[in-house]
């Protein structure tokens, strides 16, 4: 489904108003907190899925969502993500067709209004605007502390749980939901995690570096074309903090790797990004970080899902029962001349270290 089909002129107007109203949304969020303070459940044991894109983050999100034990942002929360309870009371009255359709990535994954999606970054952008430079994102460091953000985000997680609980609950005996997010940019915060991230478990999937790099370049080219054809697509992706591809591309500048980076149209750019990212990940993993091998997840679904359930303290059957949904990703044809052998060896060495330390 194209953006033209999904977002008419009235939708676009509403979204643009919301995208420019961060301060107003924050004020509404404070009102929302006062109104619903006594109804907000705790946000215990949250799970944060984060990695470079095209590594399996979306399938992990869908697998966990399907267990019925997690609460996450969905398309229904757009565009007033900072105040989901108030927006839900208003928007559900005119909810339209919820038919699942292929998402903009053109990768076969189906989404609908009730599908979980990665909108959490809008909260981070509101509180940390200085990290989003013109052509890059600056990783969080030890002196990046913001108690106001910590309090806001903790309450925000509880609001998301409340929205999903009210929508899905079928009785008082339902188990409490856990907050779940997919946010690729949380890897930029591994070295100095704000308090909410320190309270949860981070799932970090990884994939064969050359194949993941090829997949990222393909998406970059696809979204560059989409952005050229429709500026609303670019504005939408930038507003929700999706700076992975296209004209809104802002890579995370891990250890200043961008200083000598090639053009993003070259495969070497994405492979160097992969190396810089996962080296950073290896430097900052701890007991709350779970490395997930996408190869094992798709080659050995039952056993991999059982291990994943174990590390997340879930009953093993709630994930293992979904094993048939997992399949190896498509293989991208890569010209060997595009990847210098030294760069390939460097990436393979990082991949081997990840694989040795993987929990799943």
Please place each PLM-identified region on the residue numbering.
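PAPS-dependent sulfotransferases, especially Golgi type II membrane carbohydrate sulfotransferases
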Residues: 1-41, 217-360
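Pre-Walker A (Motif I) flank of P-loop NTPase domains
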Residues: 44-46
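ATP-binding Walker
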Residues: 54-55
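A conserved segment at the C-terminal end of the G1
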Residues: 58-71
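PAPS-dependent sulfation machinery
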Residues: 76-180
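Short catalytic-loop micro-motif centered on adjacent basic/acidic residues
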Residues: 178-182, 291-293
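Conserved phosphate-donor/acceptor-positioning beta-strand/loop module used by diverse small-molecule
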Residues: 182-184, 193-218
């Amino acid at each position: 489904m194209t953006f033209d089909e999904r977002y008419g002129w009235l939708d676009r107007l509403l979204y643009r108003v919301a995208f420019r109203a961060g301060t107003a949304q924050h004020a509404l969020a404070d009102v929302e907190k006062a109104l619903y303070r006594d109804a907000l459940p705790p946000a215990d044991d949250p799970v944060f899925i984060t990695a470079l894109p095209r590594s399996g983050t979306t399938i992990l999100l869908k697998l966990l969502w399907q267990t019925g034990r997690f609460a996450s942002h969905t398309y229904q929360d757009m565009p007033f993500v900072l105040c989901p309870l108030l927006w839900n009371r208003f928007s559900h009255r005119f909810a339209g067709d919820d038919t699942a359709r292929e998402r903009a990535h053109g990768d076969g994954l189906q989404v609908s209004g009730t599908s979980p999606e990665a909108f959490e970054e809008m909260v981070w952008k509101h509180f940390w605007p200085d990290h989003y430079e013109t052509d890059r994102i600056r990783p969080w460091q030890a002196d990046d502390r913001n108690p106001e953000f910590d309090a806001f985000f903790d309450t925000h997680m509880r609001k998301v749980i409340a929205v999903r609980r009210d929508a899905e609950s079928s009785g008082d005996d339902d188990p409490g939901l856990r907050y779940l997010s997919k946010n690729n940019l949380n890897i930029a915060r591994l070295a100095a995690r704000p308090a909410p991230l320190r309270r949860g478990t981070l799932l970090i999937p990884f994939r064969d570096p050359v194949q993941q790099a090829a997949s990222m370049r393909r998406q970059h080219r696809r979204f560059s074309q989409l952005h050229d054809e429709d500026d609303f697509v670019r504005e939408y992706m930038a507003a929700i903090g999706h700076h992975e591809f296209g004209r809104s591309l802002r890579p995370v500048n891990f250890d200043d790797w961008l200083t000598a980076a090639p053009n993003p149209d070259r495969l070497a750019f994405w492979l160097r990004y992969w190396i810089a990212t996962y080296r950073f990940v290896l430097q900052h993993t701890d007991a709350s970080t779970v490395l997930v091998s996408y190869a094992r997840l798709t080659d050995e679904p039952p056993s991999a899902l059982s291990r994943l359930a174990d590390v997340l303290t879930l009953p093993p059957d709630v994930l293992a029962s979904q094993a048939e949904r997992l399949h190896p990703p498509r293989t991208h044809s890569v010209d060997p001349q595009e990847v210098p052998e030294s760069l390939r060896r460097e990436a393979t060495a990082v991949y081997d270290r990840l694989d040795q330390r993987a929990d799943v």
